[in-house]
Amino acid sequence: MTIRIVALVGDCYGAPGGIARYNQDLFESLVTADLQGPNAHEQQAEIFVVPRLGDASGIALPAHIRQWPPVFSRLLYSLVAFWVAWHHRPIDVVFCGHVYMAPLAWGLARFFGARYWLQTHGVDIWTPQRRLKRAAVEKADLVTAVSRVTRRRLLGWANLDPHRVRVLPNTVRDVFAPGIASPAYRERLGLRGGPVLLTVGRLASTERSKGHEPIFTILPALRAQFPDLVYVIAGDGDDRERLEARARELGLGQETVRFLGYVPDEELPDLYRLADLFVMPSATEGFGIVYLEAAACGLRVLGGVGDGSNDAIQDDRVGAMVDPDDPNALLRAIETGLNNGRVDPAAIEAYRRPHFARVARLVLTELMEAPLQRRLP
């Protein structure tokens, strides 16, 4: 039996960022191995991806995954999603990768008699939604959340059976592993060998709570103890210019703060390996795949309190959590992190692809075996 899945996503193949990578990992896990259950040998997932961003042309996609060209217009996107579902009917599952598209996903699931799976990541789902989105969330047959915090925040306002809300965290790829950074790469970045603090993430004006500015304010005190320390920021976005201006206002030159811009995926392992501490004391991270990538490379990590990064940091097993609004605590945490050395990457083994794939396939099997939720408005 083929399980046909229409996936409505913001981005997937051909797009950067943690959510795009999550979608890729999830879909590949669902199509590359048998599902669980007594009839597993008879089942095969086939996924039709409809993205709003990200062009997969020229990318060799895994077998049983097809991705359509990106469509940003809301109306046109809805028409394309309906056409894809109609053309490939019967459809068994409508997967929704963002609450923004939940009403459309719910409508398609009702029309085609399919099960409806909603994936949630972070702040997009932490607060109550307006009437239509709320109804679409509450009608999901299955909701998966990347962290315990996201699950708890969602259940705090949505009328959902807790048994229908499962935690399915990010996974980390095998390319992220301990090693020695290429000397040529370090030379290319102009790093002379002093301690390196590293943050990796999109610099978006809608995501200003990743902790860059609190770190800026304590860099002079840190450099008093570690004179050659450099804070390296990898990532690009519409907030980069403001952050660069803020660093200049504080008198932090290139010798102290280095903005790298976008870093290709293939360079990330070397970037993590040359750093001494990964720092992203965020207040609104849904999970944070970058924490896992850093820890997988042996790098100790520093996250914020109260958000989903706690799951990645595993209650201090691979680092620590700190309040970014407390400069003294932040300073002490970074000092401790720099003095404590590297971590054992075995601590994040549960987040490797084999375990993630088993849980993902089990979740899909449970969804297919569970009765459909009532589709009444």
Range-by-range predicted roles:
Residues 283:
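Aromatic "clamp/platform" in nucleotide-sugar-dependent glycosyltransferases that forms part
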Residues 339-375:
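A charged, aromatic-enriched C-terminal amphipathic alpha-helix characteristic of glycosyltransferases
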Residues 315-316, 320-327, 335-341:
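Conserved acidic donor-binding segment of nucleotide-sugar-dependent glycosyltransferases
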Residues 96-102:
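Short His-centered aromatic/hydrophobic patch
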Residues 8, 191-210, 216-219:
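Conserved donor-binding/catalytic core segment of Leloir-type glycosyltransferases
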Residues 241-263:
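Nucleotide-activated donor-binding/catalytic signature segment of Leloir-type glycosyltransferases, i.e.
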Residues 137, 262-263, 270-275:
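Short alpha-helical donor nucleotide-sugar binding micro-motif in glycosyltransferases
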Residues 300-303:
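Short hydrophobic beta-strand element within catalytic cores of glycosyltransferases
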